[in-house]
Each structure stands twice: as C-alpha cells, then as structure tokens.
Amino acid sequence: MAIAYAREGADVVVSYLSEDSDAAEVKRHVEDAGRRAVLIKGDLADAQHCRDVIATAVDQLGGIDILVNNAAYQMTRTSLADIPDDEWDRTFDTNIRAMFHLCKAAVPHLKPGSSIIGSSSVNSDMPSPTLAPYAATKAAIANFCASLAQLLGEQGIRVNSVAPGPIWTPLIPSTMPPEKVANFGSDTPLGRAGQPAELAPVYVLLASDAGSYISGARVAVTGGRPIL
C-alpha cells in the first residue's frame, strides 16, 4: 500500500516490526516513485510506539493526510483451550488497540479532506472458527471505523474500512498449517487468492479526491465472497 500511495504522489511513513529487508525494499520502491519514505521500527502493540509513529509523521513530513491501519496478527487454533491468554491479548493489542492509539494521536493533526482507513476482513462477517481472536478484532475494526465516520464527519474527516478476503501476504505462510496454505483462496468464487497489488487500489481510492463522498463504508475485496 505504501508503494501504491507513493505512485500517486504521497510521501509515506511505514511502521514495521522486525522485517528490515522488507522495509528497505518498500523504501526503495517508494523512492523509485520519486517520493520520500520514513521507516520506523517498533511494535504497534505498544501504545507509545503508536504515538511516536504519528509524531514522526508530523515532524518529518509536515503533517498527516491519510492514516492506514493495516497491522495484523493471527494464529490458527483448532480449539478454544489451545489459545494462550497472551496470544489473545497480542491479537487484540496489534489489531484493534493499536488502531485506537494511532487514531487518537492522529486526529488532532488531520485537516478537512483527510482520510482514515482500517483493514477489516471477510472474517468480520464470516468468522473462521480457527481464527476466533483475529475474526473478533476484524469485526471490531469495522465497527470502530463506522463509529469514527459519524464522530469525525463534522471535521471533514472520512473514515472507511476495507474487508479483504484471502490475500497473499507473509502473514499467511507464517501463521497457517502447510495444508491450508497450499489451497489458500481456492474456495472463493474466483477460485484463487488475491495479490496485494489487487487490493491496494481500493485504499488509494478511499484516500483520494475521487472518494470524497465515501465515508462510513466497508469495501469488500473478497474474490466473490459477498458481505451483505
């Protein structure tokens, strides 16, 4: 997504956990597009890091126009008893608590026309039984975005969420059993998983002037799985 925004003329701040080589590659692509990338290493599950990310964006780039909440953590578990307490907490801290702290820190800097986007999931409506904590956070993100759209509308700030279906990201092979990875996305009407490049344009639209009347929406990018 950072690359897609850069290609449309945006400078970007990217928070990443530990993937130094991946972050450097994103920075290279952003700079190839003629824009600036500021990388911040840290854990968004830490509220202070969330505040530091926003402060860095304001200090280094002069302000914030778009806030994309895209960090996620998940693990596949086949029974409730198998979910460790700390894993439940980490899932909520990374997926929804971080969004709260990022939004709270960012809103005072957002001007009319700014955009907040949250990454929900098809799991918000069709929760997988083996991804219970993750699915719960994705439903929370969708509802939080819907609340913020109403809360911030008078300030001219638009808020939307995106509900991806199966998309190939590093999260998939690192958190799913091999037999599920092999068939990932094959049960969608389109018969395959999506690529990040097929998802990113939706985020660009929601942040652009072309999406100036889109707020309070949840956009499904699911390969044909309906969200009604």
Task: List each model region and its residues.
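Substrate-binding pocket helix/loop in short-chain dehydrogenase/reductase
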Residues: T78-L80, P84-F92, K180, F184
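Active-site helix of classical SDR
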Residues: C103, T137, C145
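Short, small/polar-rich loop/turn modules that mediate ligand/substrate recognition or access, typified
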Residues: G153, R158, I214-G216
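The beta1-alpha1 cofactor-binding region of Rossmann-like NAD(H)/NADP(H)-dependent oxidoreductases
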Residues: D20, K41-I54, D85, A197-E198
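Short C-terminal tail/terminal secondary-structure segment
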Residues: R77, M126, S186, L190, ...
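Canonical Rossmann dinucleotide-binding motif of NAD(H)/NADP(H)-dependent dehydrogenases/reductases
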Residues: M1-V13
